[in-house]
């Protein structure tokens, strides 16, 4: 076996002559002395187990010429196609079911909002899974700190220096390397379809260049598939900026890592794992379920300078990496973690493969001693990487999607079963509802006729009561009109312009006062009576329509923003517009005043005696009139006998009085002298002078007392008589108007309630008509639910077959 190992090493180094046997033996001794935990010891153990197959895999040229048909990655390709087909059926099924559930929710409240949202969430969930499954490749993402050699590792696996690498921060954006069908390499920037020469990657992705891209931007590099077997099998490499460059790790993961199948953490073997590197993969493990992670301790060639502490450092790094994968991330067990930690030199491997491409032996690219071990370790990483993809990718990726597909179909089937049961119950409820509606409509029509008769009678009685109360209250207020007018305190002046304003304000005062007094006496009681009647109407109508929605509608129509208020339209401005005051001074004991006072009494007697006179004229007797009981001496000034006066009309009597007064006024001087002469001869001059002096004093007193106050009192007295006469004329009209307002209020309320009941009855009739159609729809829904349940069973059977063919044999 030692000879086999020496021969394999010689094939790698290019030295096969016997002169190098000592060197080969020295190399073998180095392998033996490296200890059981070293990479070469692990490689030696693997060699002894796998024999010549392992030796063939160690040859760098062998993987370049592997047949694509025999690649283990083809299992993944076939499985991916099958699971994509199944998920296409699942997506169609989920869309069909969700559309049906949404329509069912709109037609009848069988499905609640939470269930409907859950069905809709399956649409997005399946679409997200399909988006991952429909990729044409597997993605491998490389992460690590700045200048740890991520780009160098990808270049070594691609066997050419494609990505920028070197000292310092080299990769400033995400670079995605994927296979192209053509023989030329090109690149495309994010948001552009222009194909650029791959040489320009140094100008687009290098941080040292003036024209640099954003850290989260993506540059896609298309490399010929035939130049790398991994690209030929649709594997994509993603190079990233250093995790310590930007704090936007969540954006990086969301934009570039959610669909990654394998993550490679590239560490610097000269230092320990940093918090930034750990934090990034902690975030990845939170967003992805158990990601596949490989850890490469790069730049291990630096350990050749300190061979005495090489093993202790390696053991320390290995232990920390295993603890990170098992205890912190919990993505693998210790055995799997130990198989995913490697110590390599990417730069050295890249140089060796470049020399190999030139036809030179690989060892010409060696940087330090121990090249063979590091080179074998890198080959071991590539082999384990392919095995992980071919053996684990299908299981870790598709098994989860298969289980989720079963879970989706199973959950939907269970929910559909529950909905089917609820529809059955709902159908029974609909049938019972139909029977209840029929009975309710018949009872409503009968009770509606009875309530209408009772409410009409109640409105009629209330209207009569209101008319009587308003008439009585208004008459009482008219009787107290003098008190109301005395309360008016506006300054009075007999000037015509001022007097017109005074009358206008007095009319407004009377109208306001009467209205206020009537409202104080009647409005509260009337409003309470009206509200009580409306409440009774509403309660009676609500008893006819117990539906909550109709009750709310009728209540909204009846409720007023303000209580009912009676409007008393007196309109004193127009009513007393014909009032004409008489503010001229009149001596109360003057001849004209005496005549007017006498004629006034005569008018009163004539008004009282006029009906008797009419009766006497209409009686059969007509011949002789009965003598008057009033003696002639009671009216010495009147020149006509009482029977004649009793037969004179008021218009004729007024004309006679005016003529007498005017005659006396025109002949006052002569008449006065005649009367004075007669009285002088009859009673003597002393008595006449005394009476004249007394008469003059009385006249002078009344004349001096005729002030604005006296004029105002006279004006108000005249206004009271005039307003009382006018207001009594509208008592019946006002009371009728108020009763009409009450009638309108109650009638409109009852009419609205009747319309509400009629609407409810119409709705119930319409509901009866729609119940049969709803029952037919429910039957159709039950048939559709059965069909959807059968489709769910079919999908579960398809997933069982997929697991048996692709997941169980693995």
Swiss-Prot record:
Domain Dynamin-type G, by residue range, is: 134-382
Region annotation (G1 motif) maps to 144-151
The entry's note on the tissues where this protein occurs is: Widely expressed in embryos, accumulating in the mesoderm and endoderm during gut development. In the male germ line, it is expressed in spermatogonia, spermatocytes and early spermatids.
Give the UniProt keywords, A-Z.
Coiled coil, GTP-binding, Hydrolase, Membrane, Mitochondrion, Mitochondrion outer membrane, Nucleotide-binding, Phosphoprotein, Transmembrane, Transmembrane helix, Ubl conjugation
Which GO molecular function entries does the Swiss-Prot or TrEMBL record give?
GTP binding; GTPase activity
Q: In what way does this protein cross or attach to the membrane?
A: Multi-pass membrane protein
Cite the residue spans of the region called G2 motif. Answer: 170-171
Phosphoserine sites (modified residues): 38, 554
| Residue intervals on the Cytoplasmic side | 1-637, 690-810
- The region called G3 motif is annotated at 239-242
* Subcellular location(s) of the protein: Mitochondrion outer membrane
Coiled coil residues, start to end? 427-476, 759-806
Query: What family does this chain come from, according to its entry?
Result: Belongs to the TRAFAC class dynamin-like GTPase superfamily. Dynamin/Fzo/YdjA family. Mitofusin subfamily.
Oligomeric state and interaction partners are given as:
Interacts with Mul1.
Q: What does this protein do?
A: Mitochondrial outer membrane GTPase that mediates mitochondrial clustering and fusion. Mitochondrial fusion is the physical merging of mitochondria that gives rise to mitochondrial networks, and this process is counterbalanced by mitochondrial fission which fragments networks. Promotes, but is not required for park recruitment to dysfunctional mitochondria.
Q: What is this protein called?
A: Transmembrane GTPase Marf
Name of the encoding gene: Marf
């Amino acid at each position: 076996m030692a000879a086999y190992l020496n021969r394999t090493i010689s094939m790698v180094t290019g030295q096969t002559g016997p002169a190098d046997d000592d060197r080969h033996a020295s190399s073998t001794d180095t392998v033996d002395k490296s200890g059981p935990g070293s990479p070469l010891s692990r490689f030696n153990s693997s060699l002894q187990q796998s024999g010549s197959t392992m030796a063939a895999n160690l040859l760098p040229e062998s993987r370049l010429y592997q047949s694509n048909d025999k690649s283990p990655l083809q299992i993944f390709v076939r499985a991916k196609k099958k699971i994509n087909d199944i998920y296409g059926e699942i997506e169609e099924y989920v869309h069909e079911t969700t559309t049906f559930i949404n329509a069912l929710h709109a037609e009848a409240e069988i499905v609640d909002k939470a269930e409907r949202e859950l069905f809709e969430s399956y649409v997005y969930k399946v679409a997200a899974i399909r988006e991952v499954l429909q990729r044409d490749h597997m993605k491998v993402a490389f992460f690590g700190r700045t200048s740890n050699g991520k780009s160098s590792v990808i270049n070594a696996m691609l066997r050419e220096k494609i990505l920028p690498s070197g000292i310092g921060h080299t990769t400033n954006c995400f670079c995605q390397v994927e296979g192209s069908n053509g023989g030329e390499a090109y690149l495309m920037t994010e948001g552009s379809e222009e194909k650029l020469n791959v040489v320009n990657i140094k100008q687009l992705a290098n941080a040292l260049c003036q024209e640099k891209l954003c850290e989260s931007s993506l540059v896609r590099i298309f490399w010929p598939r035939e130049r790398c077997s991994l690209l030929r099998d649709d594997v994509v490499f993603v190079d990233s900026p250093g995790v310590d460059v930007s704090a936007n790790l969540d954006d990086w993961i969301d934009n570039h890592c959610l669909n990654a199948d394998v993550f490679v953490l590239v560490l610097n073997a000269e230092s320990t794992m940093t918090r930034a590197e750990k934090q990034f993969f902690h975030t990845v493990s939170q967003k992805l379920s158990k990601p596949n992670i490989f850890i490469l301790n790069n730049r291990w060639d630096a350990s050749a300078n300190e061979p005495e502490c090489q093993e202790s450092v390696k053991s320390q790094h290995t232990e920390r990496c295993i603890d990170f994968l098992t205890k912190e991330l919990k993505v693998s067990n210790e055995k799997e973690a130990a198989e995913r930690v490697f110590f390599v030199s990417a730069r050295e491997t890249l140089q060796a493969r470049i020399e190999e491409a030139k036809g030179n032996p690989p060892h010409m690219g060696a940087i330090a001693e121990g090249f063979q071990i590091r080179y074998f370790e890198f080959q071991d990483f590539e082999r384990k990487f392919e095995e992980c993809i071919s053996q684990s990718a299908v299981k870790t990726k598709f098994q989860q999607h298969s289980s989720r597909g079963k879970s989706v179909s199973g959950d939907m089937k269970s929910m559909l079963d529950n909905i089917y049961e609820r529809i059955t119950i709902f159908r029974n409820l609909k049938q019972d509802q139909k029977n209840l509606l029929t009975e309710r409509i018949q009872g409503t029509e009968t009770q509606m006729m009875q309530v209408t008769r009772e409410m009409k009678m109640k409105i009629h009685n209330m209207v009569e009561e209101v008319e009587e109360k308003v008439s009585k209250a208004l008459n009482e207020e008219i009787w107290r009109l003098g008190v109301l007018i005395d309360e008016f305190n506006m300054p009075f002046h007999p000037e015509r312009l001022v007097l017109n304003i005074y009358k206008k304000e007095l009319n407004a005062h009377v109208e306001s006062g009467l209205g206020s007094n009537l409202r104080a006496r009647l409005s509260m009681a009337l409003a309470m009576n009206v509200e009580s009647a409306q409440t009774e109407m509403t309660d009676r109508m609500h008893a006819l329509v117990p539906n909550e929605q109709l009750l709310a509608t009728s209540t909204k129509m009846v409720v007023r923003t303000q209580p009912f208020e009676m409007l008393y339209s007196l309109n004193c401005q127009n009513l007393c517009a014909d009032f004409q005051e008489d503010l001229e001074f009149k001596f109360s004991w003057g001849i004209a005043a005496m005549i007017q006072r006498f004629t006034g009494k005569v008018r009163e007697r004539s008004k009282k005696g006029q009906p008797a006179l009419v009766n006497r004229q209409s009686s059969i007797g007509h011949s002789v009139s009965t003598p008057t009981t009033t003696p002639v001496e009671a009216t010495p000034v009147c020149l006509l006998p009482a029977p004649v006066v009793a037969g004179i009309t008021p218009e004729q009597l007024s004309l006679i009085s005016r003529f007498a007064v005017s005659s006396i006024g025109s002949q006052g001087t002569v008449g006065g002298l005649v009367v004075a002469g007669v009285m002088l001869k009859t009673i003597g001059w002393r008595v006449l002078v005394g009476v004249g002096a007394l008469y003059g004093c009385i006249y002078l007193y009344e004349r001096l007392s005729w002030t604005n106050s006296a004029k105002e009192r006279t004006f108000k007295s005249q206004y009271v008589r005039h307003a009382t006469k006018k207001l009594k004329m509208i008592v019946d009209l006002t009371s009728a108007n108020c009763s009409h307002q009450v009638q309108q209020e109650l009638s409109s309320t009852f009419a609205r309630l009747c319309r509400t009941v009629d609407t409810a009855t119409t709705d119930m009739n319409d509901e009866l008509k729609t119940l049969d159609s709803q029952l037919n729809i429910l039957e159709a829904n039950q048939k559709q639910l059965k069909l959807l349940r059968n489709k769910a069973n079919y999908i579960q059977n398809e997933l069982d077959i997929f697991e048996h063919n692709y997941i169980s044999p693995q």
